[in-house]
Amino acid sequence: MSSQEASKMLRTYNIAWWGNNYYDVNELGHISVCPDPDVPEARVDLAELVKAREAQGQRLPALFCFPQILQHRLRSINAAFKRARESYGYNGDYFLVYPIKVNQHRRVIESLIHSGEPLGLEAGSKAELMAVLAHAGMTRSVIVCNGYKDREYIRLALVGEKMGHKVYLVIEKMSEIAIVLEEAERLNVVPRLGVRARLASQGSGKWQSSGGEKSKFGLAATQVLQLVEILRAAGHLESLQLLHFHLGSQMANIRDIATGVRESARFYVELHKLGVNIQCFDVGGGLGVDYEGTRSQSDCSVNYGLNEYANNIIWAIGDACEENGLPHPTVITESGRAVTAHHTVLVSNIIGVERNEYTEATPPAEDAARPLQSMWETWLEMHETGNRRSLREWLHDSQMDLHDIHIGYSSGTFNLQERAWAEQLYLNMCHEVQKQLDPSNRAHRPIIDELQERMADKIYVNFSLFQSMPDAWGIDQLFPVMPLEGLNKSPERRAVLLDITCDSDGAIDHYVDGDGIATTMPMPEYDPENPPMLGFFMVGAYQEILGNMHNLFGDTEAVDVFVFPDGSVEVELSDEGDTVADMLQYVQLDPNTLLTQFRDQVKNTGLDDALQQQFLEEFEAGLYGYTYLEDE
């Protein structure tokens, strides 16, 4: 692939920015993965890897997970805060506390724990706390307990403290403190407490309601004062050691982060004035990732990098401490998305393509009705004059005629052949107009976008949007999507991607397209009979755990991929994926009962025994097969 072609492809899909040096296009026009950019020789051709796995029986769709990316993300964030602390003379420590709600899979938690980097864990429920406590012996670090808490949750956290772990119970509701003090006395343990302050500062974007005065969690200023007095009266003021706030997930604008940290730093100062020895400053989540690669303030991008993020936090806290003569606290961030998003790619196969093809135009019958004649006259005029200023007018005239023909068809004025002729001529018109439009002409941009959407290939992909990318459906989250191969060809086609659920919402509506977002996906020319595999990137945060079972499509298979400098690759199956039986059991449909009921029906058909046996074997094989489409 020439450098010019490679450059164009990188710009089209913006992979140079959202790929973050983990993903690239190689000289064959294939996606390559480098799990550790500090070791550039350790990389793998993803297209070839998937083909090799398929030859060994790998089913698609499947998640290809790269634990080494997780570890590199953790090292990168820790390094950014180390540089910031050194740059500003900050004396406090820093810990990244991983909120396991982002991805609770064992492979994620243990890959991070075994990275050799300092790491804490955060839980937001009883189940998560049990997972965290069980792994706490591997980290000997910090545990932060957030979320709503009942007596059992609080007892579990205090048991962890009694066992020698640093467990911070963050008070988010005033009702929690009485239970904490009661259970601490019962267990004879000094609780280690935090308080979540509800800030006036609020970020922007899809998760802005996580912060601000109307946020679901946290204590208002009055309640913070009440908490201090309750603890003082109980003789437990020294237990309050951590200050926590949260502006929201995926903060796009660094100014919002800086504003929130400055406000929360005032809480740190004021609490010290009240005699509260706050030792840890937990700024929560918010560190975003650039799904678009546009480096902007849009909801799916960020206008800052790791160094700027760390610098703003360390400077704001350090400045408040210096101004008021206070010690530098340990800084904690709960940066789950930034750690996990990049490490997982969903790979799937295309199962069908529907194209709007150009065909040779033929005139209507001489006695054809006026709308048909009008469409043909417009077609001839466009070919005879070639006047670009009339392109929009010609397209609009054809649209009006086609609209009249559709109405006439419903009333019986036009027959099926006439409707088909009109629709095909309109497609031809769109093809011709599209060829003559100039993307550099701003006046042409709206009509180019309209035609790209109208003429795009419909590509049916073997996956469930609701299971594998629920945020794309639920909140219009954008995820980068690319073919894994054929990227040494110019992206001449446009496409929309549709899943295999029986739901019209099962479609991807937005795609990365250069420095912007489009409603269609750029695609290189491809053979519809042998289409490329597709990769859905940056799905490592939230998607696996939020995925739902629409149409009873289950978890996909998942593999962990390890890449080494000598070019060797190790692949481990980490999740076999759900069978049909698994999904049926989840909705209380027992597979054995279903098989018995089906067997009884087959017996009553009167078919010969061999055919009955064939039907039973096919039903049973389906029960214990993959929930997604499989080739014979």
Curated annotation (Swiss-Prot):
Substrate binds at F281, D282, V283, G284, G285, G286, L287, G288, V289, D290, Y291. Its EC number is 4.1.1.19. Pfam families: Arg_decarb_HB, Arg_decarbox_C, Orn_Arg_deC_N. Transmembrane segments: none annotated. Keywords: Decarboxylase, Lyase, Magnesium, Metal-binding, Polyamine biosynthesis, Putrescine biosynthesis, Pyridoxal phosphate, Spermidine biosynthesis. InterPro entries: Ala_racemase/Decarboxylase_C, Arg_decarb_HB, Arg_decarbox_C, Arg_decrbxlase, De-COase2_CS, De-COase2_N, De-COase2_pyr-phos_BS, Orn/DAP/Arg_de-COase. It comes from the Bacteria. GO terms for molecular function: arginine decarboxylase activity; metal ion binding. It catalyses: L-arginine + H(+) = agmatine + CO2. The modification N6-(pyridoxal phosphate)lysine is found at K101. Pathway: Amine and polyamine biosynthesis; agmatine biosynthesis; agmatine from L-arginine: step 1/1. One of its GO terms (biological process) is arginine catabolic process. Its cofactor is Mg(2+); pyridoxal 5'-phosphate. NCBIfam families: PRK05354.1 (NF003763), speA (TIGR01273). Catalyzes the biosynthesis of agmatine from arginine. Belongs to the Orn/Lys/Arg decarboxylase class-II family. SpeA subfamily. This is Biosynthetic arginine decarboxylase. It comes from Klebsiella pneumoniae (strain 342). The gene is speA.
